[in-house]
């Protein structure tokens, strides 16, 4: 199974909607899962609220390992998880983008510089 995941803390909703539209158009084979703050365990959120409440990175990206752990509990062996930050979107089918590279690799990571000058 193919999963496309994204995190929405409410600060980039317009960009996330554009990203999700592009996934629905160009990645029809993906099951889309949108995580948000309510997916962070309450105990963890309370303990690290001083970080998670900071605006940069939705709390300095502290939510990423939490959501990675959650998605890994959902997926099965050989499933594919595709994650993209909200500032990006697809303009064409991206099946070849991952299929070609996944033949010889278990994990793919791309490095992109966000369009936002503050990062």
Feature-to-residue mapping (PLM):
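Glycosyltransferase catalytic domains, chiefly GT-A lineage
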Residues: 1-119
């Amino acid at each position: 199974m193919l999963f496309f995941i994204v995190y929405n803390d409410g600060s980039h909703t317009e960009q996330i909607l554009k990203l999700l539209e592009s996934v629905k158009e160009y990645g029809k084979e993906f099951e889309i899962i949108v995580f948000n703050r309510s997916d962070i365990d309450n105990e963890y959120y309370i303990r690290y609220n001083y970080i998670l409440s900071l605006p940069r990175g939705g709390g300095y990206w502290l939510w990423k390992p939490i959501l990675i752990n959650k998605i890994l509990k959902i997926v099965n062996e050989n499933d594919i998880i595709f994650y993209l930050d909200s500032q990006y979107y697809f303009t064409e089918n991206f099946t070849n983008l991952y299929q070609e590279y996944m033949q010889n690799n278990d994990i793919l990571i791309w490095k992109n510089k966000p369009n936002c000058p503050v990062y």
